């Protein structure tokens, strides 16, 4: 049992070090986009492929926006008579 414990400790403490064999592994050669990969909900609802994944969220947001727009159009009074 103690041997298994030592193997687990050894396996979790191994620190990877950079290798000079593969030049594609260093950061200079693998430049990626600086843009964040995550989309905001508004961006996702605007993209058809992403919209399908969170359709209920997009529809709820559209319904809320429509209700809010309708509420803003209602006449209101500041004083009660």
UniProtKB/Swiss-Prot annotation:
It comes from Conus pulicarius (Flea-bitten cone). The cysteine framework is I (CC-C-C). Alpha4/7 pattern. Transmembrane segments: none annotated. One of its GO terms (molecular function) is ion channel regulator activity. Residues 46-48 are annotated as: Lacks the Ser-Xaa-Pro motif that is crucial for potent interaction with nAChR. Expressed by the venom duct. Residues 1-16 form the signal peptide. Residues 17-36 are annotated as: Disordered. This is Alpha-conotoxin-like Pu1.5.
């Amino acid at each position: 049992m103690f041997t298994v414990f030592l193997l687990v400790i050894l396996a979790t403490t191994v620190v990877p070090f950079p290798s000079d064999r593969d030049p594609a592994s260093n950061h200079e050669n693998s430049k990626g986009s600086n843009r964040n990969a995550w989309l905001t909900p508004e961006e996702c609802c605007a993209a058809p492929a992403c919209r399908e994944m969170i359709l209920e969220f997009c529809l709820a947001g559209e319904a809320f926006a429509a209700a809010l727009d309708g509420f803003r159009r209602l006449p209101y009074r500041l004083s009660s008579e």
